[in-house]
Structure formats: C-alpha cells, structure tokens
C-alpha cells in the first residue's frame, strides 16, 4: 500500500483513481550525465516502481553499480510537491549510517530528476515476506536490531521517518538492513517540536497521527511502525490489515489486534510488540530500552544472515553458548549503533534550510542539492565507490608530474588547488633548528630516557625524531634530511578500521590485507592475508614486546576466543567498509630483523584526527574530513590519501613546496607528536 499524505483519515478511504505519478516517468535515456561533476551513468533495467518514481539499475564511468530513482518533472506540478522532493533529498543527503540507504548523487536533465542511491541487491522486506510468508525469531532479532540502530541515528539528528514499513526497508547483498525513502520524513527544530501533518501508510500509521492531530506527533511514531514491522515479519501480515482503509483506522483506534494461535511466537516477542503498539506514545520504550528487552537476550542470536533466508527458512542451531550469544549480540548492536553507550554512522552536514528561490526555465534542483564533495562514511556498507578525483588529489598529481621539475611551479599548483585546513592553535611555537637538532636528540637521549622507561625509549625516540624531521622539512632545512638513505621499502598503512573499544578493542586492516585487533587488555592479535599465520603480541609497559607466532590451525586454546572475534572483525570490515585507497597491489615490506607481521601499537584520538602508530614506527593521521597522511618509519616519505581514495607519495624533504593545506596538516602532526612525547616524559 503506497505512502500517502492525508488531510483527514477519511480522505484515504475513497481515494480518487488517477494515474500514478511514476507513470509520468518514461524510461530515461541509456546514457545519463551529471554535468556538474562530469560523471556518466549507463542506465540498465527497471528494478522497481513506486507511487512517485521508477528505479533503474545504473553503472557509473568507474564501474560502480547503483540504483537511480527517477522522478519525472511533469509529476512536480506545484511548489508543494517540489518542496517535498527538496526535503526528501536534503534529509537523505544528511544521513550516513550502515543501515540507511547511501545517498550517492543527485542531478537533473530537461525531463527528470535523478537520485543515485546505494543499490540494495536483495530488495525489500516486503518481497522477502511474500516469498517466505513468515520469518524466524533469530532473523527478526537481527533485523530489528539494525532497524532500531538506524532509527536511533535518525532521531539523534532530529529526523522522524514517518513511513517505516516493509517496502521501505531494503536488504543489501549481505542481508543487512537499509532503510530508504525519506519522502515523508520530518526534520524537527528541537526535541520538543510536534508535527501536525497526517501522513503515512495506512497499515503502519501511529494512532497519534490519525486521532491526535491537534497535539501533534514526534519520534514515537517510528517506534509504533517498528512494532507493526516486527509483528508482520513474525506473523506474516500487519496487525491491523484489512481490505478497507476505514476498517484499518477503526482497528488502530481501538488497538484491536491479536496473535494467531497457529503461529509459534514467544512470550518475549509478544511482550515487545505489545509495548511498541501502545496507544500512549509517552509510555512506549526508548530505543535503547527496546534493545534491552528480554526478546533480544533469549533464543539464538546470529552475527550475520545467510543467503538461505532469501528463499527458505534457515535451520538455526538448537543451542548457543552464552558467550557466543553475547558476542554476536554485542557485535550486531555495536555495528548498528544501538544499545546504551553505542552509536554508529557519521555526523554529516545537517540538512540545510530549504530554498524557495524562483526557478528559471526547466531547472528544478537548487545548486545546493548537488554536493561537490561526497563524504565517504567511516563505516559504509555496499560497493566501493571511485568518484571523480578531488582538487587535492588532482593538485598532488600535478605536482608529481610537473614537467619542469621546479619547486616553484609545484608550489603554485598545490597552493592554488588545495582546500584549506586550519589546525588548532599551536602548542609548539619554537623555531626548528637545522641538523643539529637530530644530533642533539641523540646526545640528550641517555639522560631523558630515564624518564620514559625501557619499553617507551624506542617509541619516544621515534616520536621525537619524526616530529623534528617534519619541522625541519617545513622550514626548508632539507640538507638535514639527506644524511640518511631514502625509504626503499613500501610503506604499509591502515586501509580499514572499526572501533569497538567500548567492548573489545579496535580492529583494522593493513594495505597488505593482513588484519589485526588491538584489544582493550593491551594485547594484539594478527591474521595474515592468506589466513595461515596468527601472531599474538603482548604490550607490557616496561619490557620489549614479545610476539608469539602460530599456524592458524594450531592456535592455543587461551586465545581462540580472540581469534574468533578477530574473524568477526575481518568479516565485518570485508563486507561493510570501504578501503582508504582504491584497489592496488601492495608489495609486502621486508622485515630485516624478524619474520613478524606489522601491527598497530598505539592509537590516539584528537580533535582534528585519529592517529595510528604501527610497530615499525609508521605514523598515520586520519583527519575528520577523510583525508589521511602517512609518514614512513624513517620520516623520509609521506603518503597522502585524499577523500576520493587516491594515493600519492611525496618526499618529505619537499615539504616547503607543499600546498598550504598539506603543510598545515604536517604542522598539526608535528605538534601532536611533540605533545605525546612530552606526556611520555612525565607519565
């Protein structure tokens, strides 16, 4: 049943028959072009049709497959419908959560408006339920956890979806929930604001929308709809379903529904549904309280859903250990950002106030609806994107490919093209001296190392030398950097990471495809790219780190639970996260001193970035605007990864010729390292 905006409940009872707005949308051309970004899309088959749009499979000129939601301009007859579309676009653009359909692009031609969205290969829960008739409780437990995580994220951003239903809840290729269609979404100015519009899909509308329009409604309407969804998944149809809309509303008003005796449903599931389908919105449970309900803590808890669910009822194990249940529950809850203390998603730009400027000619979309920079979320599910190179990456390539080789030409290109980055006020204001600083560092090492302890000494030297070399490079003291051989070995860096430090630790993947977890108990577990070798490392405070290497098939019992958790991290990152760089072949660095793998030894969050330090002294700074700077272990070379995931290597000795943006980032890195070294001396 289509979503409708309803002035009065009775208007939905006897709607006038008229052509769907989507019928006004003819099949668009085979080749589509976003003129602003100069991105081309090839249009393929129609994969869906709703009340107001048609959906087509498209492929961009980088080979990425998306879904294009196509709205005919002829269907936008008045300012009200145009503003409604603008609102949908701006709200959806502001969303960045692993369980919300990704918004990729937006553009128009003379006939249509195109919304390029993340493709959900396994379609909607409506289509799944048509095939399956009913789902099992473990499936519903998993899906509801992700639905609630997406709702928690929306509500935190003061967005009410208002049209949560089976048809708007999609599944990606890994059977993860993706909530879409923000056509009826409302953005609140503050948490106390109430919305008055009567809107929604009859089977899912909360009673306060229909019958308390004077008092208005708020976030709780989405929880009512979530209860309807949960009931439908377990029973096979919505609780108030009827052929007549008038009867549906009568049942909603009376809260008249029941649980069929021929359906096996647990008491916990019934209780949770009943609490969500409470007429008084003020006593519906909060989202985190819902996840704390007994329904989510009994039965079987899956960490993923197999493709088997798409066509048949899965057979779940008859029993599950408490540790396995809790681990899977924590994993799914943390990934979706639901549960007390958890959050997921990226705080993107808040929705802009809608523009009501007059529109010239055939143009409908304001320019602000086509963002020039698409910010990739830290946690992202779906195909990896390869957008048009950013200004930063273009400038860096121009600098590296400069034909005359002069520093002046490179300075001009980099400075003119890069965007500015403003670091926090410097805590280190002294001028950096030339080569004597590194020599004096060595001379003073003995007296100062007594302050930092045995284990910290090598780290302290690494941090101080890196900070000093960056400072000298920025001040054009390049002669101080030529006394050592340039880096000849490839530089590894972190391509993916996910933070579960509230429960376990921080997981990451390196550019050689090895995977590791830095656990909260100061241990690290590493898994080689070929999954044949496991390395376990302790991080003692005052002695040298001692790694233990095992064949993957002979891991001791004492660390098997950590290995299982690492595999969960690996699986999650493989399915859900984009790499920091486009796919390339990376040569594995040779280790002259041992056969051990590199691992992340330290990480530090600051206001501007998160810093990682690898065990061989490589530093990596991931800035909040998704640009990354990697500094080699000898501080001879840096790698710049821009937010479009392009990778450029530059010699640090040319820092004086870098763009103001990159120089500012290096200054910030230097200051952070200096501050860290100082703290090591006094800790």
Swiss-Prot record:
Result of altering residue 197 to D: Enhances kinase activity
Catalytic activity: L-seryl-[protein] + ATP = O-phospho-L-seryl-[protein] + ADP + H(+); L-threonyl-[protein] + ATP = O-phospho-L-threonyl-[protein] + ADP + H(+)
Gene: plo1
Binding site for ATP: 47-55, 69
Modification Phosphoserine, positions: 442, 585
Domain Protein kinase per the UniProt entry, residue ranges: 41-296
Protein name per its UniProtKB record: Serine/threonine-protein kinase plo1
Effect on the protein of changing residue 197 to V: Loss of function
The protein's assembly and partners: Interacts with abp2, cut12, cut23, dmf1, sck1, sid4, spac1006.03c, spac6b12.08, spac26h5.05 and sum1. Interacts with moa1.
Species for this entry: Schizosaccharomyces pombe (strain 972 / ATCC 24843)
Purpose of the protein: Serine/threonine-protein kinase that performs several important functions throughout M phase of the cell cycle. During prometaphase and metaphase, phosphorylates the kinetochore component dam1 of unaligned or unattached chromosomes to promote mitotic sister chromatid biorientation. During meiosis I and together with moa1, required both for mono-orientation of kinetochores on sister chromosomes and protection of centromeric cohesin from separase-mediated cleavage. Behaves as a 'septum-promoting factor', and could also be involved in inducing other late events of cell division.
Region (Localization to the spindle poly body): 317-683
UniProt superkingdom: Eukaryota
Interaction with cut12: region residues: 322-683
A GO term from the CC aspect: mitotic spindle midzone
Region annotation Disordered: where it falls in the sequence: 375-399
Family: Belongs to the protein kinase superfamily. Ser/Thr protein kinase family. CDC5/Polo subfamily.
GO biological process per UniProt: cell division; homologous chromosome orientation in meiotic metaphase I; homologous chromosome segregation; intracellular signal transduction; meiotic centromere clustering; meiotic centromeric cohesion protection in anaphase I; meiotic spindle pole body organization; mitotic spindle organization
Subcellular locations according to the entry: Chromosome, Centromere, Kinetochore; Cytoplasm, Cytoskeleton, Microtubule organizing center, Spindle pole body
Effect after changing residue 533 to A: Loss of function and impairs interaction with cut23, dmf1 and spac6b12.08
Keywords: ATP-binding, Cell cycle, Cell division, Centromere, Chromosome, Cytoplasm, Cytoskeleton, Kinase, Kinetochore, Mitosis, Nucleotide-binding, Phosphoprotein, Repeat, Serine/threonine-protein kinase, Transferase
């Amino acid at each position: 049943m289509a979503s409708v905006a309803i002035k009065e409940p009775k208007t939905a009872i006897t709607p006038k028959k008229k052509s769907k707005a989507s019928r006004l949308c003819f099949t668009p051309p085979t080749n589509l072009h976003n003129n602003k970004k100069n991105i081309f899309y090839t249009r393929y088959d129609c994969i869906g049709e709703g009340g107001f749009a048609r959906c087509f499979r498209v492929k961009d000129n980088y080979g990425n497959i998306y879904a294009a939601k196509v709205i005919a301009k002829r269907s936008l007859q008045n300012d009200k419908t145009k503003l409604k579309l603008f609102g949908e676009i701006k709200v959806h653009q502001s969303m960045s959560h692993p369980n919300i359909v990704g918004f990729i692009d937006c553009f128009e031609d003379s006939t249509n408006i195109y919304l390029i969205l993340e493709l959900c290969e396994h379609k909607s829960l409506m289509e799944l339920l048509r095939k399956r008739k009913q789902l099992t409780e473990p499936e519903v437990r998993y899906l509801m956890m992700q639905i609630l995580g997406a709702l928690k994220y929306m509500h935190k951003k003061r967005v009410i979806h208002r049209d949560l239903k089976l048809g708007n809840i999609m599944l990606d290729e890994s059977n993860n929930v993706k909530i879409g269609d923000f056509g009826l979404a409302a953005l609140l100015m503050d948490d106390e604001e109430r919305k008055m519009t009567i809107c929604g899909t009859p089977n899912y509308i909360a009673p306060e929308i229909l019958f308390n329009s004077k008092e208005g409604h708020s976030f709780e309407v989405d929880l009512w709809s979530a209860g309807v969804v949960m009931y439908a998944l377990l029973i096979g149809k919505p609780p108030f379903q009827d052929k007549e809309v008038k009867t549906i509303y009568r049942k909603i008003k009376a809260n008249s529904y029941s649980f069929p005796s021929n359906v096996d449903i647990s008491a916990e599931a019934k209780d949770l549904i009943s609490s969500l389908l409470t007429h008084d919105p003020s006593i519906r449970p909060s989202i985190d309280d819902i996840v704390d309900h007994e329904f989510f803590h009994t039965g079987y808890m899956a960490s993923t859903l197999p493709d088997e669910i798409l066509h048949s009822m899965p057979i779940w194990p008859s029993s599950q250990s408490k540790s396995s249940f809790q681990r899977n529950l924590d994993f799914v809850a943390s990934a979706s950002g639901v549960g007390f203390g958890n959050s997921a998603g990226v705080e993107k730009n808040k929705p802009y106030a809608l523009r009501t400027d007059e529109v010239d000619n055939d143009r409908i979309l304001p320019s602000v609806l086509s963002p020039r920079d698409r910010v990739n979320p830290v946690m992202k599910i779906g195909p990896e994107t390869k957008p048009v190179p950013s200004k930063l990456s273009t400038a860096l390539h121009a600098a590296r490919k400069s034909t005359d080789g002069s520093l002046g030409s490179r300075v001009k290109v980099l400075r003119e093209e890069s965007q500015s980055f403003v670091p926090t006020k410097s805590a280190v204001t002294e001028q950096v001296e030339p080569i004597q600083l590194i020599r004096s560092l060595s001379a003073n090492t003995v007296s100062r190392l007594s302050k930092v302890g045995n284990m910290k000494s090598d780290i302290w030297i690494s941090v101080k030398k890196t900070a000093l070399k960056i400072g000298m490079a920025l001040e054009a003291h390049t002669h101080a950097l030529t006394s050592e051989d340039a880096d000849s070995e490839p530089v590894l860096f972190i391509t993916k990471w996910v933070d579960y430090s509230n429960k376990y630790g921080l997981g990451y993947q390196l550019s050689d495809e090895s995977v590791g977890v830095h656990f909260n108990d100061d241990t690290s577990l590493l898994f080689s790219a070929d999954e044949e070798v496991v390395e376990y490392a302790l991080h003692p405070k005052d002695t040298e780190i001692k790694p233990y290497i095992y064949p993957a098939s002979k891991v001791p019992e004492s660390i098997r639970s950590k290995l299982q958790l690492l595999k969960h991290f690996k699986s999650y990152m493989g399915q859900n996260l984009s790499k920091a760089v486009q796919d390339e072949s990376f040569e594995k660095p040779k280790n002259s001193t041992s056969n051990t793998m590199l691992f992340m030894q330290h990480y530090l969050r600051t206001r501007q970035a998160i810093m990682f330090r690898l065990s061989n002294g490589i530093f990596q700074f991931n800035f909040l605007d998704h640009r990354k700077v990697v500094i080699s272990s000898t501080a001879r070379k840096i790698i710049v990864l821009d937010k479009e995931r392009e990778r450029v290597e530059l010699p640090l000795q040319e820092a004086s010729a870098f763009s103001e943006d990159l120089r500012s980032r290096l200054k910030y890195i230097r200051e952070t390292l200096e501050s860290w070294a100082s703290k090591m001396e006094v800790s």
